[in-house]
From Swiss-Prot:
Family label: Belongs to the AccD/PCCB family.
Annotated region described as Disordered, given as residue ranges: 288-308
Record pathway: Lipid metabolism; malonyl-CoA biosynthesis; malonyl-CoA from acetyl-CoA: step 1/1
Organism: Vibrio parahaemolyticus serotype O3:K6 (strain RIMD 2210633)
Alphabetical keyword list: ATP-binding, Cytoplasm, Fatty acid biosynthesis, Fatty acid metabolism, Lipid biosynthesis, Lipid metabolism, Metal-binding, Nucleotide-binding, Transferase, Zinc, Zinc-finger
Any single Pfam family the record assigns to this protein: Zn_ribbon_ACC
A single Gene Ontology CC term: acetate CoA-transferase complex
Catalysed reactions, semicolon-separated: N(6)-carboxybiotinyl-L-lysyl-[protein] + acetyl-CoA = N(6)-biotinyl-L-lysyl-[protein] + malonyl-CoA
Name of protein: Acetyl-coenzyme A carboxylase carboxyl transferase subunit beta 1
GO molecular function annotations of the record: acetyl-CoA carboxylase activity; ATP binding; carboxyl- or carbamoyltransferase activity; zinc ion binding
Residues in CoA carboxyltransferase N-terminal domain copies: 25-294
Record lineage: Bacteria, Pseudomonadati, Pseudomonadota, Gammaproteobacteria, Vibrionales
């Protein structure tokens, strides 16, 4: 065997070993570009263990990891999108729906589940961004209303994880109508004295941010989530001014009072559970106090000398 044949044999052996590694074992962080073991990333709830970058998460997995195991019931599964306008751009709307259902594995862009969080009854919903950019159409609006109705019926809180590009253009005015429809439903929830916690994840834009996503009794942002209405370039072209760096990130919004807090995804169950327990006066042994300093003495109103 010549020296050239030996080299070729070794290279073939190495390439065959590489080919034996199945796809999906490794992935790369979209922020620090660190190569990560996919199973480890899943265990860490799609948060990079190297730089803590919060990657986009599937809606179904988000709800399954957020709610307690067992007793989870999905709502609104009978609702499916329809092409009532026979809309066509570069593709027919029907074709876009079929492609999105095939790629995402979901019927539409919102999943609603009823279950428990740390032993407390809860209704939770999450947007699936891989389904047409998490856009809000008639089915999304109808499912969200079902979530509100279920929360009212069970006298419990509602939590929504938003990840959307906004209203679905293929449904025209019917998609814009969902902004008013979901807002009106939340007003009914508020009248019953039940809390709505909105968790804004990356990205939350357009008609969703301009309606239900910003109507929470408490608005929570994930770290470095993109949150806004129009994109940076559109705004700059409209106002003809340069905008500050990161002005649509959750940290900037928290600093300027647009959201109430930023919570790491890995702490979301306990933080949201603690908030709901406080807001509903629910006693649960699984809930850890949301107070950062539980040993701190409670604040007392100072007495005022009325004579002086």
């Amino acid at each position: 065997m010549s020296w050239l044949e030996k080299i070729l044999e070794k290279s073939n052996l190495v390439s065959s070993r590489k080919a034996s590694i199945p796809e999906g074992v490794w992935t790369k962080c979209t922020s620090c570009e660190q190569v990560l073991y996919h199973a480890e990333l899943e265990r860490n709830l799609e948060v990079c263990p190297k730089c803590n970058h919060h990657m986009r998460m599937k809606a179904r997995r988000r709800l399954e990891t957020f709610l307690d195991e067992g007793n989870r019931v999905e709502l609104g599964t009978e609702l499916e999108p329809q092409d009532k306008l026979k809309f066509k751009d570069s593709k027919r709307y029907k074709e876009r729906i079929s492609a999105a259902q095939k790629s995402s594995g979901e019927k539409d862009a919102l999943i609603v589940m009823q279950g428990e969080l740390l032993g407390m009854p809860l209704v939770a919903c999450a947007f699936e961004f891989s389904f047409m950019g998490g856009s809000m159409g008639s089915v999304v609006g109808a499912r969200f209303v079902k979530a509100v109705e279920a929360a009212i019926e069970n006298n419990c809180a509602l939590v929504c994880f938003s990840a959307s590009g906004g209203a679905r253009m293929q449904e025209a005015l019917m998609s814009l109508m969902q902004m008013a429809k979901t807002s009106a439903a939340l007003e009914r929830l508020s009248e019953k004295g039940l809390p709505f916690i909105s968790v804004l994840t990356d990205p939350t834009m357009g008609g969703v941010s301009a309606s239900l996503a910003m109507l929470g009794d408490i608005n929570i942002g994930e770290p470095k989530a993109l949150i806004g209405f129009a994109g940076r370039r559109v705004i700059e072209q409209t106002v003809r001014e340069d905008l500050p760096e990161g002005f649509q990130r959750s940290e900037f919004l928290l600093e300027h009072g647009a959201i109430d807090m930023i919570v790491d995804r890995r702490e979301m169950r306990q933080r949201v559970g603690g908030l709901i327990a406080k807001m509903t006066n629910h006693k649960s042994p699984l809930v850890v106090s949301v107070n950062e300093s539980p040993n701190e003495e409670p604040y007392s109103v100072p007495e005022v000398d009325e004579k002086g």
